[in-house]
Amino acid sequence: MDIYPRYQTKEIKATKSASNELWHFKKDLWDVLEILEQGYPCSSSKRKSNIIENCIKKGNKIHKAVVANCGNYWLVIHFGIFSYKKRRF
């Protein structure tokens, strides 16, 4: 039995600060897996080639997960939730 969810056959783990962010928003690594599988790329800036930044829209909120490929596992380095507002021009 695996205690960590898997994405592309690699376990998903979290840094201490990302773990605190997940806890603050009452989310866990299974929510990160959902964002990675069903979300869309939403990188707002240039990232290293081994880093994935995916988002998923839930209601009027955007859930963002930033994970790094560390070879044998994925490491969550940031998790955040922010509001979504349509811009009017």
PLM regions: where:
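Ribonuclease/tRNase effector modules and their secretory precursors
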Residues: 1-89
